[in-house]
């Protein structure tokens, strides 16, 4: 048999068992002009923020991603987000930010909350999932926590009634409850998710959380193909640490979502690897998923050992939001390869690598 015939037979055999089939998916057909570079507002923030945002900048440059950053210095001790920063976000529609430290107590409000309220970023989304190669107590965890971002206990409606007595108001409206429920079910529908769980405390807060549940139930009727159930928040936390694989998409009021997302992140590998973002009708802000106020310890900053994985994955979410799916896939795949390989991991993941070493490893894995 000739060498040419032997080669043809080998190729036929490879195609027959599937190993020669290309893995590229059905092509993404962009609209004319979709490849034009997009401006993104960049807020490095406090603590580890500049380290991890710089990691994103390096990877984007290595990928030749069609975005460019407008960088602004914003810090948690500021009383307000500077007007020029808000103007940039409103113009660009998209922002990537590091952690902004929130002072505990005192009269300084959280800039993270200010951004959400002023831009009407009504939905916070945190994706908590197992990364191949990263050992955790539980397997098959893939939870999306969707949290109402603009009202509830975080509305900031507090005052001192008389000396020594402080009143803090929890505000729940039908409009905001329906809006977040619609977003959760729409997300589940568009991402082939099978179940939405509403988290509440309506057994005690019968009017406020009762209104939230009523709104979720009304929206659920419009999505008969998606299973809907409800769970009390304290039982939810217990179930999360016992059997997290039972959850799919979770929709919550503001405070509960913060607690649930951080718990789910801890179960799936830690806040250092969980992506997330905040979205409204017109704007989106992407950040480390489970803790917007996480600025790390001074020692981590001094040693340059901040974990950039969460913000890199959040950047992949941002690229999909900007209609650059192939760049998002390349970035996400490279990050997952580095985690699976296990050679470059920061201290929170059981390694000794620096931020730069992780960045270099991700860049080396880019297709």
Swiss-Prot record:
Subcellular location: Mitochondrion
Key words of the record: Magnesium, Manganese, Metal-binding, Mitochondrion, NAD, Oxidoreductase, Transit peptide, Tricarboxylic acid cycle
Main localization category: mitochondrion
GO molecular function terms noted in the UniProt entry: isocitrate dehydrogenase (NAD+) activity; zinc ion binding
GO cellular component: mitochondrion; plasma membrane
Endpoints of the signal sequence: none
Coiled-coil regions, chain positions: none
Keyword NAD recorded: yes
Expression tissues: Ubiquitous. Predominantly expressed in roots, stems and leaves.
Classification via InterPro entries: Isocitrate_DH_NAD, IsoPropMal-DH-like_dom
Keyword Ribonucleoprotein: no
Transit peptide: 1-25
Any one Gene Ontology BP term: isocitrate metabolic process
SUPFAM superfamilies for this protein: Isocitrate/Isopropylmalate dehydrogenase-like
NCBIfam families assigned: mito_nad_idh (TIGR00175)
Similarity remark: Belongs to the isocitrate and isopropylmalate dehydrogenases family.
Assembly: Heterooligomer of catalytic and regulatory subunits.
Function of the protein: Performs an essential role in the oxidative function of the citric acid cycle.
Protein name listed in UniProt: Isocitrate dehydrogenase [NAD] regulatory subunit 1, mitochondrial
Species name: Arabidopsis thaliana (Mouse-ear cress)
